[in-house]
Amino acid sequence: PQPEPDPEPVPQPLPEAGPLNALTGLPKAEGVAQDARPVAVMVANNDRALPQRGLAAADVLVEMLTEGGITRLMALYADMGSVPQVGPVRSTRDQFVQFALPLNSILAHIGSSVYARNLLDVTGADSIDGLYLGRTAYWFDEARSNPKPGGYLKEYCWFTDAALLAAGRDHLGIDPAGTVHTLFRFSDTPTPATGAATTVTLSFSGAAEAGFAYSADTGLYAKSIFGAPHTDEDGTPLQYTNLLLLNCNITLKPDGQVTEFDMTEGTGWYCTAGGVLPLIWQKGGPKDDLHLYLEDGTEVLVAPGKSYVAYLPAGRENAVVFG
């Protein structure tokens, strides 16, 4: 007789964060309200935008392709008060909105694709959009925009921080509090690895790559970009306890330009402590939680700490290489 296939996993609700940081699974910082909502800030990531500011302080960093083979970042902070000066802030896309929605996040960006704007409107998501709020919620760095040599295009000179975001939030009447579930099912005894991953190389496209090197001394993966350590402008390195590398079917939307992400399900890998295990991920609709499973349907337990999440083109050769 043929073996019975494993049953389709039935998603179990992720726990409310309560006293824990919803994005890291660690205790919340002193003075942070238990019902504080996370903030998700869109940040440019192409070579002309470097160096960035405020990424090392983010609890979660999400990287996905946009147009032209480049990637963009979404930096998530567990509460608005913890947001340092961050940027350069750029426009959002619907795939990033879909990731942020189940976390009850307040989104921060300057502009959006028409698809992202439609999704924001349909879902009623709270969005601090600099296209409408301008200097109420964002700051233009005049010194950074000086003409070359050494100057930046104006779109890479807009930044924000906790105080500016709070001003934008209050201007729009956004509630800073709400129910927040944890991003993952966190555990001090994470699901054991099945292979080694002390180095990880990611290829999003011919123009966008990322690398990670694990340090046993720190227990963290240090990120690299364009072959060099990825640091904030002040030199702080970007380091993570967890790497979630998710294969995703990526095509083009009907306009032939904007990327279309199938955010419902796929395969991937989870790296922590120098090890890796394969997984299956499921999300469903835009507001549904992201769930991580083993092949037998057991939910993956993730180590508390900061996480980097990448959505990579399914089927791309050498999109992920472990060393």
Set out the residue ranges of the language-model regions.
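A surface/extracellular/periplasmic glyco- and lipid-processing/surface-interacting theme
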Residues: D6-A58, E67-G323
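Sec-dependent signal peptide cleavage junction
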Residues: P1-P3
